[in-house]
Amino acid sequence: MTPLQLSEQGKIFHSQIRHLLQQLESNLAELRGGSDYAQRKIKIAAAHSLSLGLLPSIISQMPPLFTWAIEAIDVDEAVDKLREGQSDCIFSFHDEDLLEAPFDHIRLFESQLFPVCASDEHGEALFDLVQPHFPLLNYSRNSYMGRLINRTLTRHSELSFSTFFVSSMSELLKQVALDGCGIAWLPEYAIQQEIRSGQLVVLNRDELVIPIQAYAYRMNTRMNPVAERFWRELRELEIVLS
């Protein structure tokens, strides 16, 4: 028996009702003279790598008007939370479906996934993309970055690899790469310090560098005033990733 599911219109209505209830709760808290935490709270669901690589920069550039409730989750789960009204907005990657109604979006930045590995005592790469059966540190197959990397590997059938480690989290893959366990495709914003220090080496093959784009998404229905203010502030930001 197929469980009942909301239609797309039903999901939009559900999201609208959630925002109205949140605003009502905020108004009641203000009337009671209670804590302003609920009144200023921004709920964001973010892809794992963006929660570490992007959110600290955004929070530091925002005026002190908000309190933050951040959940780092898989991309697909973040989209579900947005559709169901459980998040004011999500920080995720390029998704054609989310670039159209009933959603609104802000493009935050562009970056790249570089194939990298640890260096030896002479600063040389421990592994090479042309060696047979190089150990691959990959993202989960159904994750956004996993899909990008697997498509690239399929196009470049000359690459010979053996998957050694799989995770949905960039930071975990980076640590395993730093430990000298294999080659990983990692986002530029997550490895700048390690590249500068020589701990990680970029394996220079331009055709294997993968472009990525990060976006903020929301439903295009009206949110509560605090969330609307956050969205306006976010549009004005110039994102700088260190």
Curated annotation (Swiss-Prot):
The keyword Transcription regulation applies. Induction: Transcription decreases during mid-log phase and is maximal during stationary phase. The keyword Cell membrane does not apply. Pfam families: LysR_substrate. One of its GO terms (biological process) is regulation of DNA-templated transcription. InterPro entries: LysR_subst-bd. Keywords: Transcription, Transcription regulation. GO terms for molecular function: transcription cis-regulatory region binding. Belongs to the LysR transcriptional regulatory family. NCBIfam families: PRK10082.1. Represses EHEC virulence expression. Down-regulates expression of LEE (locus of enterocyte effacement) and iraD genes, and alters AE (attaching and effacing) lesion formation. May regulate transcription through interactions with another HTH DNA-binding protein. This is HTH domain-truncated transcriptional regulator QseD. It comes from Escherichia coli O157:H7. The lineage of its organism: Bacteria, Pseudomonadati, Pseudomonadota, Gammaproteobacteria, Enterobacterales. The gene is qseD.
